A protein has these predicted regions:
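Formylglycine-dependent sulfatase
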Residues: 1-374, 378, 382-408
Length: 408
């Protein structure tokens, strides 16, 4: 993809945890106001129902909309993908390290695995209903996740070793059925989130253990998808965006990934938590083999797709900006020079060009509280190791004033 498209080295997601990050991408709004601040759990509401998603918007233009994989924006009735603008959903509705919700309904044709039947599955649901200890439930139910089709469970426990392959298969099947009309596919594999699973043919494939194997499998399936689009004659009319929801879960050690040379990972407002890989490919529309270090944000995807679909952006309440001119001419167009760091629904820092200011006045910018004000020059210090707050006092004051302006 990078050889054929545009690689973004300063791409930011809206939050350093799953649900909040996904909410930012799908609404085009900062997490200060999109209603999702942290991580959702089974049997919970998620993205507020008054929020408009990319799928909601594109449906009004005649797009077929499909969601595949991890949803994590609410699993109660009214909050699942088919309630939020998607015509079809296939996947696990939250993180694959969680457990079945007691409100979920089983399809009459549900496939039960691992010695389960309907009675045993219903017992699991009653256990979840009685017990509110999340950690205990995860341990006792051993990550038994439900696989959904639209609003019903069609497999329990889900065979997680085959989910990546099946998600991509279903996405390609959906595209094939809808190739004569515009389509929007939101494809979010459960991997490489822990617990890690891979298909048998990918076990031991990498030199990076199970985590590397999971990444290899995703990579291979992305290749399958791109080949499918080419074979179907859709490559020139389909933009493909590849990214991640947040940085690596460092507490999981070798199974959690790494963001080096960036600092920290998931849960953190340092670069390793919110700066993720991103590649955009669109045959004959985006220059091939380009790399850009311009600041881009996931909230920019919504307004960009609206403009490409020739829709009126002014009808939507968005924080993102359009990237249409930038992606066709990345060398000469600078879309934005500023990014706001948001954690737990609050603005906790700002980047302006090469400077990053994190006041950290007791807020949880990192997994541990840090009361020290910090100023970094990210171009010279990509690992955020050298705090220049006391040395560059004029720049610190400038950034502090800028942050105050953005916070009001």
């Amino acid at each position: 993809m990078a050889e054929d498209g545009l690689r973004l080295t300063n791409f930011y997601v809206s939050a350093s945890v799953s649900s909040a990050s996904r909410a930012g991408l799908l609404t085009g709004q900062l997490n200060t106001r999109n209603g999702v601040k942290g991580v959702g759990w089974p049997d919970s509401k998620g993205l507020p129902t008054d929020k408009i998603t990319i799928a909601n918007a594109l449906k009004t233009k005649g797009y077929a909309t499909g969601c595949f994989g991890k949803w994590h924006l609410g699993d109660l009735d009214g909050y699942l993908p088919t309630d939020r603008g998607f015509d079809y959903y296939y996947g696990i509705p939250y993180s694959n390290d969680m457990y079945i919700g007691y409100t979920h309904k089983f399809s009459p044709n549900c496939v039960f695995t691992d010695g389960y039947n309907l009675d045993k599955a219903l017992q699991d649901q009653q256990l979840v209903k009685r017990n509110k200890n999340k950690a205990q439930l995860k341990k006792e139910l051993n990550y038994a996740s439900p696989l959904f089709e639209n609003k019903e469970i069609i497999e329990y426990p889900c065979d997680q070793a085959t989910t990546t392959y099946r998600y991509f298969n279903k996405a390609m099947e959906f595209i094939g059925k809808n190739k004569k009309q515009p389509f929007f596919v939101y494809l979010t594999p459960s991997m490489p989130h822990v617990p890690l699973f891979v298909s048998p043919q990918f076990k031991g494939k990498s030199k990076r253990g199970l985590y590397g194997d999971a990444v290899e499998e995703i990579d291979w399936n992305v290749g399958r998808l791109l080949n499918f689009l080419e074979k179907e004659g859709l490559s020139e009319n389909t933009m493909v965006i590849f990214t991640s929801d947040n940085g690596p879960w460092l507490g999981m050690k070798e199974n959690g990934g790494s963001a080096l040379p960036l600092r920290d990972g998931k849960f953190s407002a340092y670069e390793g938590g919110v700066r993720t890989p991103c590649i955009i490919k669109w045959k004959n529309h985006i220059p091939a083999g380009k790399v850009s270090d311009h600041i881009i944000a996931s909230i920019d995807i919504f307004p960009t797709l609206l403009e490409l679909a020739q829709m009126d952006k002014s009808k939507y309440d968005l924080d993102g900006i359009t990237l249409t001119k930038f992606i066709s001419n990345p060398d000469n167009v600078e879309p934005r020079n500023r990014y706001l760091y948001v954690k737990d629904g609050k603005i906790v820092g700002i980047r302006q060009n090469d400077w990053i200011y994190l006041p950290q006045t007791g807020r949880r910018v990192t997994p541990k509280r840090n009361f020290e004000q910090e100023l970094f020059n990210i171009r010279k210090d990509i690992g955020q190791k050298s705090n220049l707050f006391k040395k560059e006092t004029k720049k610190a004051q400038e950034m502090e004033q800028l942050l105050q302006q953005q916070s009001h």
